[in-house]
């Protein structure tokens, strides 16, 4: 019915169409009011740390955009304190910690109190109903799954046995980069090459088999990219209670379901492989988990392992391009070591002997922590923070980026300076303070399960790529863009392009 407004010696009279619309709007506003009141009531049982002033419905969302979230929160902490409350929408407060002492309280000293997770609802579709290491609350299931990954697939013996295969992989990566450079006037995009090498490595640890055929590697790589793309919708639903009813969110659910099916189609046929006893697949099957749990435990290893290591390596190469003196100093260390030991490449057993390499690795992870906000923790019981009561269910986020850029710990924190890790004492700041503040893999009981693998592969790839090539800008004076893009991990907003010249 067409909407009309009539005057008839009486107040404004609205036709049925307008009345219906008004009723719906009033009902919606009333519902939102009840939800906000309910959440405000439940939140009032504890005294929340101070934070920015909130707006109705959107909370603090108006000040959280414009740049990477971890940087915004780091800057806000300078005004509101190193323990502050941020409202993601008007119904989800989160305590943000940017201080090393409070971070250790949450992550280490009271690790079991803050060991639960609070994941966006849409992530259920890609985690077998939150039955993966990163998504599940701590408990017997989580403990068993984590031990299986760390003590079986990622055991020191197993990682050591991979060295000859990884040496072959890096030789193949170097050859592929040479071929790409030959076809593109010396210009390469290294990220995809690094990702495919990581897919191969993780595949061997999971299945105990080598994938010489690139079809599985390509498909897994593409599936990871697709799931990362659609996961961005989860943030909208996390911020606004009614966002899950929007067409865009429903579309996202359909796309995640499609990605879910792709994962299952990719992994399920491999569940029947006759895998060795030292593989992740063998462990998972021995626990009699449902197939879906096994499939997404396997996919999680790819999801969190591939992008994290390859992106960190790309960040390091970008810094070395911007700091040619650092690159040459690193190359001199690598060249002298390989010459002295009559080797053409750096091997795994060499990595801890190369002090400057390890300094570059640490400085890259300090500057660009792969998970700058980690995965938010949730209090699984009533506990405390700074002596103040914290309710069960409270979300706490530790800003790793802020810890890594604290000027009281790090001299010139925004400068890429590997030498800081080679100095016993820098202007009164001791090495212990730096060690405690450097948490690229988080800390405590929920520290990254793949930490050792990540550090080894990053160091190994970086050493051999710098030993093989001189890395430079694609054109004079055009340095790599160091802008962040935060997805599952911290990515380069503009994927790295570089000029390479073979050194040998």
Curated annotation (Swiss-Prot):
pH-dependence annotation: Optimum pH is 8.0.
Record bears the keyword Nucleotide-binding: no
Binding site for heme: 448
Any Gene Ontology CC annotation: endoplasmic reticulum membrane
Bilayer-spanning residue ranges: 16-36
Temperature dependence: Optimum temperature is between 30-35 degrees Celsius.
GO BP terms: isoquinoline alkaloid biosynthetic process
Molecular function, one GO term: (S)-nandinine synthase activity
Coiled coil (UniProt feature): none
Broad EC category: oxidoreductase
Enzyme Commission (EC) number: 1.14.19.64, 1.14.19.68, 1.14.19.73
Compartments where found: Endoplasmic reticulum membrane
PROSITE patterns in UniProt: CYTOCHROME_P450
Tissue expression profile of the protein: Expressed in roots and at lower levels in stems, leaves and plantlets.
Reaction equations catalysed: (S)-cheilanthifoline + reduced [NADPH--hemoprotein reductase] + O2 = (S)-stylopine + oxidized [NADPH--hemoprotein reductase] + 2 H2O + H(+); (S)-tetrahydrocolumbamine + reduced [NADPH--hemoprotein reductase] + O2 = (S)-canadine + oxidized [NADPH--hemoprotein reductase] + 2 H2O + H(+); (S)-scoulerine + reduced [NADPH--hemoprotein reductase] + O2 = (S)-nandinine + oxidized [NADPH--hemoprotein reductase] + 2 H2O + H(+)
Keywords assigned: Endoplasmic reticulum, Heme, Iron, Membrane, Metal-binding, Monooxygenase, Oxidoreductase, Transmembrane, Transmembrane helix
Topology with respect to the bilayer: Single-pass membrane protein
Family that this chain belongs to: Belongs to the cytochrome P450 family.
PANTHER family listed in its UniProt record: CYTOCHROME P450 98A9 (PTHR47944), OS09G0441700 PROTEIN (PTHR47944:SF4)
Chain's role: Methylenedioxy bridge-forming cytochrome P450 involved in the biosynthesis of isoquinoline alkaloids. Converts (S)-cheilanthifoline to (S)-stylopine, (S)-scoulerine to (S)-nandinine and (S)-tetrahydrocolumbamine to (S)-canadine. Can be involved in both sanguinarine and berberine biosynthesis. Catalyzes an oxidative reaction that does not incorporate oxygen into the product.
Name of this protein: Trifunctional (S)-stylopine synthase/(S)-nandinine synthase/(S)-canadine synthase
Origin species: Argemone mexicana
Protein's gene: CYP719A13
């Amino acid at each position: 019915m067409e909407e009309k407004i009539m005057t008839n010696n009486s107040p404004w009279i609205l036709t049925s169409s307008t009345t219906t619309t008004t009723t719906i709007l009033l009902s919606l506003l009333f519902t939102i009011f009840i939800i906000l009141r309910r959440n405000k009531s439940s939140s009032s049982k504890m005294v929340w740390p101070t934070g920015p002033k909130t707006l109705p419905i959107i909370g603090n969302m108006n000040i959280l955009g414009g740049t990477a979230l971890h940087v915004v929160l780091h800057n806000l902490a300078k005004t509101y304190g190193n323990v502050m409350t941020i409202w993601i929408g008007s119904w989800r407060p989160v305590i943000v910690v940017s201080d090393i002492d409070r971070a250790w309280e949450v992550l280490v000293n009271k690790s079991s109190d803050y060991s639960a997770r609070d994941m966006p609802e849409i992530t259920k579709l890609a985690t077998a109903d939150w039955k993966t290491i990163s998504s599940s609350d701590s408990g017997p299931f989580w403990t068993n799954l984590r031990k299986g990954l760390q003590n079986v697939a990622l055991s020191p013996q197993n990682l050591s046995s991979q060295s000859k295969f990884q040496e072959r992989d890096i030789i193949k990566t170097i050859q592929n980069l040479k071929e790409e450079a030959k076809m593109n006037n010396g210009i390469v995009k290294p990220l995809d090459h690094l990702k495919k090498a990581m897919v191969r490595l993780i595949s061997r640890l999971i299945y105990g088999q080598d994938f010489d055929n690139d079809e599985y590697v390509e498909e897994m790589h593409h599936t990871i990219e697709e799931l990362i793309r659609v996961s961005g919708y989860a943030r909208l639903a996390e911020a606004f209670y009614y966002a899950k009813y929007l067409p865009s969110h429903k579309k996202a659910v359909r796309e995640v379901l499609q990605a879910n099916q792709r994962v299952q189609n990719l992994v399920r046929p491999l569940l029947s492989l006759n895998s060795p006893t030292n593989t992740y697949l063998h462990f998972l099957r021995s626990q009699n988990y449902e197939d879906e749990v096994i499939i997404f435990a396997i996919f999680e290893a790819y999801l969190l392992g591939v992008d994290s290591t390859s992106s960190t390596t790309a960040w390091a190469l970008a810094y070395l391009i911007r700091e040619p003196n650092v690159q040459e100093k690193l190359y001199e260390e690598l060249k002298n070591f390989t010459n002295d030991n009559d080797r053409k490449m750096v091997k795994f057993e060499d990595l801890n002997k190369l002090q400057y390499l390890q300094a570059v690795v640490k400085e890259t992870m300090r500057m660009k922590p792969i998970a700058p906000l980690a995965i938010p923790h949730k209090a699984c019981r009533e506990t405390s923070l700074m002596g103040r009561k914290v309710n069960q269910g409270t979300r706490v986020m530790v800003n790793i980026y802020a810890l890594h850029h604290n000027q009281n710990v790090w001299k010139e924190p925004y400068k890429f300076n590997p030498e800081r890790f080679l100095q016993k004492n820098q202007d009164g700041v001791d090495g212990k303070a730096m060690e405690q503040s450097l948490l690229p893999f988080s800390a405590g009981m929920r520290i990254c399960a793949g930490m050792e693998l990540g550090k080894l592969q990053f160091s190994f790839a970086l050493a051999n790529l710098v030993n093989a090539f001189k890395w430079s800008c694609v054109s004079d004076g055009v340095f790599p863009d160091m802008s962040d893009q935060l997805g599952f991990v911290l990515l380069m907003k503009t994927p790295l392009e570089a000029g390479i010249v073979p050194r040998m």
